[in-house]
């Protein structure tokens, strides 16, 4: 049985989450972490380490409160992967 368009092969590229985290680490990107069940608080910092459970070691970390726009310096922290909802790169 022949299907139309069989001659055209579409290659799909999938980016593994661990590869994206590794890219953030290599590029020393500043990232923002949205926290699970903490909608009014975000964490920003540079990834300097991580593991297969998505636990992150962040350097120059800051706690950011969305409502008050206040920032609290945290320094170097380890954030458990269970607390992470979203990771995104932010410009300095």
From Swiss-Prot:
Gene Ontology cellular-component terms listed: cytosol; methylosome; nucleus; pICln-Sm protein complex; precatalytic spliceosome; SMN-Sm protein complex; U1 snRNP; U2 snRNP
Sm domain span: 18-92
Main subcellular localisation: cytoplasm
Signal peptide: none
InterPro entries cross-referenced by the UniProt entry: LSM_dom_sf, Sm, Sm_dom_euk/arc, snRNP-E
Subcellular location(s) per record: Cytoplasm, Cytosol; Nucleus
UniProt entry tagged with the keyword Magnesium: no
Cytoplasm is among the record's keywords: yes
Higher taxonomy: Eukaryota, Metazoa, Chordata, Craniata, Vertebrata
Family per similarity comment: Belongs to the snRNP Sm proteins family.
Oligomer and partners: Core component of the spliceosomal U1, U2, U4 and U5 small nuclear ribonucleoproteins (snRNPs), the building blocks of the spliceosome. Most spliceosomal snRNPs contain a common set of Sm proteins, SNRPB, SNRPD1, SNRPD2, SNRPD3, SNRPE, SNRPF and SNRPG that assemble in a heptameric protein ring on the Sm site of the small nuclear RNA to form the core snRNP. Component of the U1 snRNP. The U1 snRNP is composed of the U1 snRNA and the 7 core Sm proteins SNRPB, SNRPD1, SNRPD2, SNRPD3, SNRPE, SNRPF and SNRPG, and at least three U1 snRNP-specific proteins SNRNP70/U1-70K, SNRPA/U1-A and SNRPC/U1-C.
Protein name, per record: Small nuclear ribonucleoprotein E
Function: Plays a role in pre-mRNA splicing as a core component of the spliceosomal U1, U2, U4 and U5 small nuclear ribonucleoproteins (snRNPs), the building blocks of the spliceosome. Component of both the pre-catalytic spliceosome B complex and activated spliceosome C complexes. As a component of the minor spliceosome, involved in the splicing of U12-type introns in pre-mRNAs. As part of the U7 snRNP it is involved in histone 3'-end processing.
Molecular function per GO: RNA binding
Gene Ontology biological process terms, A to Z: mRNA splicing, via spliceosome; spliceosomal snRNP assembly
Species this protein is from: Sus scrofa (Pig)
UniProt keyword annotations, A-Z: Cytoplasm, mRNA processing, mRNA splicing, Nucleus, Ribonucleoprotein, RNA-binding, Spliceosome
């Amino acid at each position: 049985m022949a299907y139309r368009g069989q001659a055209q092969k579409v290659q799909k590229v999938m980016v593994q989450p661990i590869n994206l985290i590794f890219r953030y680490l290599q590029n020393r990107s500043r990232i923002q972490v949205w926290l699970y069940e903490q909608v009014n608080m975000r964490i920003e910092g540079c990834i300097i380490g991580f593991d297969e459970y998505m636990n992150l070691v962040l350097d120059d970390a800051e706690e950011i409160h969305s409502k008050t726009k206040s920032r609290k310096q945290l320094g170097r922290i380890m954030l458990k992967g269970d607390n992470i909802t979203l990771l995104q790169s932010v410009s300095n």
